[in-house]
Amino acid sequence: MAADVGQALAFLQQVKTTQGASIYEGLKAALAKVLEDRPVNAVEALETSVLSTPPAANLSVPLVPAASAAAAAAAVAKASLFGDPEPVLDPESGEPIDPDAPNEFECEDVEGDGDLLDGLGVGLGRQEMYAAMLAVKRLGEDAKRGVSTVRFFGKFFGTQADYYVFETTLQSNPDMPEAPEGTIPLEPYGEGVNAYIYFVSNTLGGPLQQLPYVTPEQIKASRLLRRYLTGRLDAPVSAFPAFPGNEANYLRALIARISAATVCCPRGFFTADDDSAELSANDEWVPLKGREMALPVNWSHRYAHLKGQGRTVTHKRDPPDEEEEPEKNFWTAEEMEAGPPPLATLDTDAPLPAATGDKVPPPAWSPVFASASVTTRNQVAGVRSNRWPGAVCACAGRHFTSMYVGWGIKAGGEWSPCPPPPPVPQWGAPAAGVEGGQQLLLECNDLPPKPAPPEEEDE
């Protein structure tokens, strides 16, 4: 008899209901409720408790594992944006160290920029833009970084991870590296392609890394390549022609090219100085209405034009004799390139190369609207770049923004890689005094030296 009772009890504890609890646990909970309430109609209350299940039991919460360790780390990093940073502990006493006072900085309305882009159906979405706003706040308040201004540049997609890019200026001028002798000097900090310092992170809220300065050679080499980013800054750039640097340098060159071509402002919002080309806000600027801002003629390039030399201001070689005028063809076409004037309108941009069968080449910019109805008032309008897919400029009233979200690949015609260099001749010139024009083999110095034979061991 005792064995039968034990088997029955084990059966009740083993059988699970659809909610995950056993029959034994359900009966025990029902009896406990009857004994606790002690109702007059105990039998009916017991039947009701057994047949009905609590609302919480109907909600099964399965444990959903993270897709990968990187996804879990990204979720933790993004969650850290919504709370106070963890205090730094003193290694000797173990007590928290008083944090530094927040750094004072200026930034654009990142959340408002997200609303403008949402109106056009582009961008990252409100949830991700809100996290980008918190990341901008954290970067700007970091006293160790010492930034003066912060702007959210956009997002680059990668095969293994993505890049979130932040454009900043520093409160103090950093030390600039010197260009190697015989190369085109890079532009100093605060000017041209090195006017801003860029920080990137793979996740919003994750660790930030400062990108290096860009050189003219890196910009010129990046124009010959078309490749995807991996998401690892230390990854090598395996391509031909060889790129002088790793993926961090390649990403920085892409940012320089994209910012010079797609960061725009409404026409007339800034005025340029005739001598220094420095921009200043125009207090008399009157914003245009809705759909008028979808015309490229009403937008201007905000950053300086990037010339073929890889600089915004061309660098000319010094003539051999400074007292005499150089020859007519002493300077190359790159050194003589003038470029468009500051704040050139977008309608002056060259169209894209026409594809096979196209009678008219596609324009460099296309209009985008928040509504297909012309009568919609106060709607957001802007332009979208066809040369750099993913670059969008939006405007509503006095609020405008420019952002890039893409793969970092330039459009425009069919692309073919550069042909390999001509093969190196295996035979040298005929040596003097050799009869019959016999050619001698050239000694190759690239091979490692021949190893010495091993020493014989004494038996």
Swiss-Prot record:
Asymmetrically dimethylated at Arg-267 and Arg-398 during flagellum resorption. Probably methylated by PRMT1. The modification Asymmetric dimethylarginine is found at R267, R398. It is found in: Cytoplasm, Cytoskeleton, Flagellum axoneme. InterPro entries: Radial_spoke (IPR006802). The radial spoke head is made of five different polypeptides (RSP1, RSP4, RSP6, RSP9, and RSP10). PANTHER family: RADIAL SPOKE HEAD 6 HOMOLOG A, RADIAL SPOKEHEAD-RELATED. Belongs to the flagellar radial spoke RSP4/6 family. This is Flagellar radial spoke protein 6. The lineage of its organism: Eukaryota, Viridiplantae, Chlorophyta, core chlorophytes, Chlorophyceae.
